[in-house]
Amino acid sequence: RPNVTLQMEVEDLRNASPATVSRAGVIFISSNDLGWRPMAQGYLKKRRKAEAEVLQSFFDKYVDLALALLRELTPRMAISEMGLVSSLLSMLTALTAEHREQLAARELSEPAETAHLERLFLFALAWSVGGTLETADRARFDKFLRSASSILPEAGTTIGSSPSDTIYSFVVSATSGEWEHWGKRVPSWRPPQGDLGAAF
């Protein structure tokens, strides 16, 4: 008589009946044992080959060092390393989609395009891995990035910037692929003139 075995992979057991749970086998693999690299590898397999090779070099160069530094700092909230790298991947997906036209204009073998992709990676790294840091720790994270990379904007030399600015004061322009100060994008707020009471 033939036997049938069903194997189902579910995210959780919220909607499972007691009969299902009693027959379920649960395998737990700690993220500490697994690490972030398999998740990054899965992400890179979905990218264009040339782009994946360039991004792989950035993952190798920055991520382990950034996570090691984060252990010495005091983030505002505790997020697992897998969660931080997941945020990094999500930001990279969004940023490369926004910059797709600019990135596709030239081959990734060109230094200008590799530098553009590295700027996007550093921006995503700062706002994912270093995104929950306070001002003092952000300055340390910025110092680490500047010691590891030579393509960060020089504070005080970009339009709208001051010498105390960090990477958090800049964004990568979708048109030029260069660093742009947030102050250039966001106009200074001025209170409306006239009687504010009339608005109510």
Give the predicted meaning of each segment.
Residues 1-8, 22-23:
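AAA+/SF3 P-loop NTPase mechanochemical coupling elements
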Residues 60-200:
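AAA+ P-loop NTPase catalytic core
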Residues 5, 11, 198-200:
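C-terminal, well-structured subdomains that either form a transmembrane helix-short loop-helix hairpin
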Residues 16-45:
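A short helix-turn-beta junction within AAA+ P-loop NTPase domains corresponding to the substrate/partner-engaging
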Residues 11, 28-31, 182-188:
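Flexible glycine-/small-residue-rich
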Residues 48, 53, 63:
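Conserved phosphate-handling catalytic cores of large alpha/beta enzymes
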